[in-house]
Amino acid sequence: MTTGTFDMSDLKRRMQGAVGVLRDELGGLRTGRASASLLDPITIEAYGARMPLNQVATVSVPEARLLSVQVWDRGMVSAVEKAIRDSNLGLNPNTEGQVLRLRIPELNQERRQELVKVAHKYAEAAKVAVRHVRRDGMDHLKKVEKDGEMSSDDLDRLSKDVQKATDETIAEIDQTLAQKEKEILSV
């Protein structure tokens, strides 16, 4: 019998999407080192719409603990400055013309532990998303088998493949989390 209409590559793509979202979220966590991705979640009210910071300015890292934001439009400097202040990143920009300089302060141990907890929360959300994709895949397989388009042997084989993909993706999430945790806790 055929394996019906089951697309394993789509399932893996959806699982990798959860990993991608996790990496984006973890990239926004401040680790004590300057990173241009730290400012990625910030949006600015510009030209009548909300725009990401990287569409109104260039973010660079001139030093290990310094971010430089070069705003392209002089009229947008105050809006960018306000958005950075209001972003809950704990950063206070120093404005010099169209350039905003952001000193990244040292993190104390308590704040590092809080960031680790946030990272764990993000990772758990990614794992839940992967498990949802797994459940959707398994439900689809069972439906295809129930409709008679797949043999029970094919169901077992594909179920194992789905579980293997799930396990690999969760291992990747754990590895990504461990890497970020190490980065956060390193002084």
Curated annotation (Swiss-Prot):
InterPro entries linked: Ribosome_recyc_fac, Ribosome_recyc_fac_dom, RRF_sf
Record key words, sorted: Cytoplasm, Protein biosynthesis
Protein biosynthesis found in the keyword field: yes
GO BP annotation list: cytoplasmic translational termination
Main location: cytoplasm
Gene3D superfamilies: 3.30.1360.40, Ribosome-recycling factor
Molecular function, one GO term: ribosomal large subunit binding
Cellular component terms (Gene Ontology): cytosol
Cellular compartment(s): Cytoplasm
Alphabetical list of Pfam families matching this protein: RRF
Function: Responsible for the release of ribosomes from messenger RNA at the termination of protein biosynthesis. May increase the efficiency of translation by recycling ribosomes from one round of translation to another.
Family: Belongs to the RRF family.
Protein's recorded name: Ribosome-recycling factor
Organism of origin: Xanthobacter autotrophicus (strain ATCC BAA-1158 / Py2)
